[in-house]
Amino acid sequence: MTSRARYLVGIDLGTTNSAVAFVDGQAADKRVTLFDVPQLVAPGEIAPRRQLPSFLYLAGEHDLGPAETALPWDRARRTVVGELARAQGARMPERMIASAKSWLCHAGVDRQAAILPWGSDEPEKLSPIDAQAAILEHVRQAWDATHPGAPFASQEVMVTVPASFDEAARELTLEAARRAGYGPIVLLEEPQAAFYAWVDSHPAGERAAAALAPGSQVLVFDIGGGTTDFTLISVGADGESFDRTAVGDHLLLGGDNVDLTLAKQVEQRLVAASGRKLDALEWHGLVHSCRLAKETLLGDQTQESVAITVAGRGSRLIGGTRRDQVSRDELELILLDGFFPLIERGALPQRTRGGLSELGGLPYAADPAVTRHLASFLHRHEVSRIDAVLFNGGAMTPAALRRRVVDQLAAWQPEHGAPRELANRTPELAVAQGAAYYGLVRRGLGARIRGGTARAFYVGAASTGGRSDTAVCAAPKGLEEGEAAALARDFELVTNRPVSFRLFSSSSREDEPGALVPIGDGTPDLVGEGDSDLLELPPIVTVLRAPGRSRATVRLEVRITELGALEVWCRDTGGEGQWRLSFDMRAGGAARENEAAQSDPDPRTPEARGLIAQAFSGSGPLKPAGLMKALEETLAARRDEWSLATLRALFDAALEVEEERRRSPDHEARWLNLCGFTLRPGRGATLDEWRTRQMWRVFNLGLAHEKAEACRLAWWIVWRRIAGGMTQGQQEQLYDRLAQLFLPSFKQKKKLAEIKPTREETAEMLRTLANLERLTVSSKIKLGDEVVRRLGEGRKAREDGLNFWALGRIGGRVPLYGPVNTVVPPQRAGEWLAAALDMDWPDPEKAAFPMAQLGRRTGDRARDLDDDLRARLSARLRAVPGGERLARLVDEVVALEAREERVALGDTLPAGLRLLPDSD
């Protein structure tokens, strides 16, 4: 992008469809024009289309030939984007990537990993970021092919994102653009873009504001393929200006949810007719067919029904095809009753532990009723009157849905009557058109929507009571592009090592900088359900490089760049430097469920740290053997009651005396045990990634007293306890080291005979291996196969329950901390479970819980085991004392209780801490 760019390009990067529009900045008539995107519409056939379907198809060796996927600008292209990708995906869903935008926001998977198409057995896959980048790259290359004299890299580009996207999701979008070869881009919220398109739709010389009375409140009601966005825009008292006054929170609720609901109804009929449930890929094919049927029925008012075909796979391909149909009446009933029910204004979204997760575990909104989410939005922002509604998104094409929303608003505001519907002739294109128009606004040639940032930002701070239960407002809502807000509060930080701040946002609070507010649990509460509406973002981290100084006093500054991105800076009050803080995308993975986990270190922690230094350095009477008891006495609490912050402070103290572990075997064993206990489970606190890196340096150094069994035991225990903080590469390295002992080759068996690990060592090795959730699937399969082999060696191998526990961890359906994309496929896990069910269980209570983890239901067909196998397991579990609860884990989608989580992990957790899967 340059300041003299000829074209202003707006890109609607949609979940289901993308679109591009532009303005020629050098033309006398600066009107918005659609860019018809060249794309493959049939094998070997290129044609321009007004929309670019946001689908990717990864062509195989036999389905599409090289000439059929070639593009004019890339003859060797094998990844198809657009119309052909959508059509071909209906035939081979295992090669199609859909809803990449939703996956980009899914914190439960590694968004850098090649995991899409989800649940597919095909070897070629893409990461969510690379899938989004492929769509953006297609736009760039298509533009360059049709505008040879105006390369895309030289134009000013605006890319839209949902208004509800947090800063982490926006940063991932920027990364996708960078991978697509884009220069700096401007991010614009989709509802604002839709409103800009409405402004631009008025004839030249006619002011859009004149169409609305001064003080009017306009609701932009935007439902796309993957998200629902509510934005409130008010008309200024002068009748000349617009202000964005409120935005809703992130809702993964859109057309995809309709497709899923429709597919579930069709599947019920198919199963009733054939007696067989669809497998994961057949289900994906059905969902895609229902998506196409929905689009057909909504786009063609003359068609009353659409045929649905689900082809069988493998041995079922011939004669395995199943057919049904979707009628217009069925679709409208689902939409009106399920997604747009008429409700009382006080009705709020239902909160459950998960909504639809049939499409690969995407974290969809638990309550599909859009009207309930709308009621919550209006209540939260204290909106009593809506004067006009601008509908946007393909999902709002049916007039019946728009009437339902208008009628609902009218029922909520009888004293004001029904709001007026603002005309939007092309809701599927308006966002791209508005984004291009915004380029003119940035040049001072159009009406700007004021309001700045939709959220206020807060930094975690200890209150006067020493508790980290408050945050201080660092930047208010409404910061405009190019503006900054400085927090008049000093922070004293350690230099030359990582420092971190907890960062929060709120879309509803109106605090001024410096205001203290309660944090709550870091999750925005529904109205009436708590005293906090702060949403916790990934923490912001940096290293303050200041040679010769151990500490620095700094102040924070929040800036909104000219491109609309959030930046947080740390400025030295002594004027010696400034540091930009970046979002730690790998942070998280643990939820603090009570104030014990949120608290600052115990006030007596400095004294406790001194005990650690004394015990290991030999500077006083305290010896390592008596250290833990001394720490409990000093902190006046049992070790399992120490808060997360206290534990990490003690770990940091232990790290400072790492060299002292070499003094004796007892020093080393006690030091390793202390580190494992105080850093467990390796995540949950900011800077845990850095702490784990410091421990990995110890791993590479190895044991100082390798011949001492106590040291060898402590060695494996520490890596098991902190595995949650390890990267996949570190876990694979640990696996390779252990595999030589646990899965030895013929040559390694001879070496193993020389080492002769004790039974206790072998048990700790297995526990460590089983806790490595980030291992590749292939490594887990090798490990699980070996455990099943050992279980089959005889009754003695099944008596203590260790092998059962290990199998439950290795093949568990729901990770405790790792990404779901490394879960063992259900086919292999099913084989393991079937083998275990054929064995006797000497101690059923020791086997029952891990086998429940192996067969646990997730709601994700790419992970769930066969229904009949789970039914066998459920019956077996019910025969065990307390087995009703375990059977429920297998029969239903339910979360683990804290006690069950500890059993699954094989360890205790710091007070108040709960594990969550990876948030990347």
What is each PLM-predicted segment?
Residues 183, 312-381, 446-683, 702, ...:
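Acidic low-complexity intrinsically disordered segments
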Residues 2-5, 13-15, 35-38, 212-213, ...:
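Acidic, glycine/GT-rich loop-and beta-edge segments that sit at the periphery of enzyme/chaperone cores
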Residues 1-112, 186-188, 193, 241-244, ...:
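Early-domain small/polar-rich strand-loop-helix modules and first-structured segments
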Residues 2-30, 203-244, 290, 400, ...:
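Gly/Thr-rich phosphate-binding beta-strand-loop-beta motif of the actin/hexokinase/Hsp70
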Residues 134-150, 197-209, 338-386, 404, ...:
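Phosphate/ATP-binding catalytic cores across multiple sugar-kinase/actin-like superfamilies
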Residues 157-172, 311-315, 362-367, 385-408, ...:
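Glycine-rich phosphate-binding loops at beta-strand->alpha-helix junctions
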Residues 30-180, 189, 257-307, 311, ...:
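Phosphate-binding loop and its immediate beta->loop->alpha context
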Residues 1-6, 187-221, 379-380, 430-448:
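Conserved phosphate-binding catalytic cores of ATP/NTP-utilizing and phosphoryl-transfer enzymes
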